Amino acid sequence: MKKIIALTLLLCMVFALTSMTAYAAEDIGDTLVLYSTMTEKDLDALISGFNEVYPDCEIEVVSGTIGETTSRIAAEADNPQGDVTWGGLADSDGMQYAELFEEWVSDESANAIEGYSTPNGIYSMDHLSTVVFAINTELEKELGLDIRSYADLLDPKLEGKIIFSNPNSSSAAWNNLCNIMSVFGNDSEESWDYIEKLMKNLVISDSSSNCFKLVEQGEYVVGLTYEDGAIKLIEQGADDHFTMRYPADGASASAFGMAVIKNCKHPEAAKALVNWVCSAEGCSYIAQYLKTLRMTNKDTVYGESLLPATEDIKWVVRDVPYLTEHKAEILDHWNDLLLEVQG
């Protein structure tokens, strides 16, 4: 009996180790070029976790906004310099960037939370990004404000004191614009009436990270941004003058993902990276490393997290198919209105 028990335990250990290193069985090469919109700490999490499984594969990172990275991929189409991209590819993109990427998704997409699997057969979705207001609480107090809702952003005291990125090139800005439309009614008169009023207080930045960094530094009172960026500053000790708040009217999230660049030089390594990130093992590693990111794999183990529990946030339903189908028209309307309001 003791021998049987010992053998059973040994087999269980072998199975567990095999499962944890399932992606390490293949030779994927020693080089991988990653284009990414993610933060430095996000990249640290991905690289350190991936290299535990594939220690011989060196990842070179090229960072930029989604507009910059996709433009670069398009310009390099005849001789691709990148292999895979992470971040900025949103579930509302539709087929906008389809010609840039391989028609391939990770098998792990089948394990995504319902509603957050691949939207187009090209993106493998790995994490969620929820909209928040980044607020400099010292400046807010000086102005005598208590900023909680979208209506609060229209206060004349905030003219030129709200920073927002460009929704034409920033997925974070598009995410926030989608949330406004989810609250006020998609491409409705009420939505555009609100947006026109909001534009009077906005300063548009080329960088989505400025929408939390420059708020924390005191250059702006409010930034319309995303929780995983803002929470990192709080984690680093900025909570004595900086906070993030979910819109009292309701918050929603975009799913963001990865895609393999068409005709890339290292497809095996690119697919191995996507598979690992989207797996329960990869999602759990990144979530526990960062403590600031919500992942898509339904089997993610979070451990300690700095983010509030899902049930503590007021959520609003986002009509992703509608926003995807009408994205070009919405952006055209945004551009025309911004020119009219700000000149």
What residue spans do the PLM features occupy?
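Conserved N-terminal structural module of periplasmic/extracytoplasmic solute-binding proteins
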Residues: A6, A25-V84
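Bacterial N-terminal signal peptides
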Residues: T8-A16
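Sec-dependent signal peptide cleavage junction
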Residues: F15-D27
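Extracytoplasmic ligand-binding site segments that recognize negatively charged/polar headgroups
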Residues: V33-D44, G67, P80-E219
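A ligand-binding cleft/hinge motif common to bilobed small-molecule-binding domains
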Residues: D91-Q96, V221-H241, L290
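Periplasmic-binding protein-like
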Residues: A110-N111, S129, D193-L198, I204, ...
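Mature extracytoplasmic/periplasmic domains
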Residues: S252, F256, I261-R318
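Conserved C-terminal helix/tail region of periplasmic/extracytoplasmic solute-binding proteins
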Residues: V316-G343
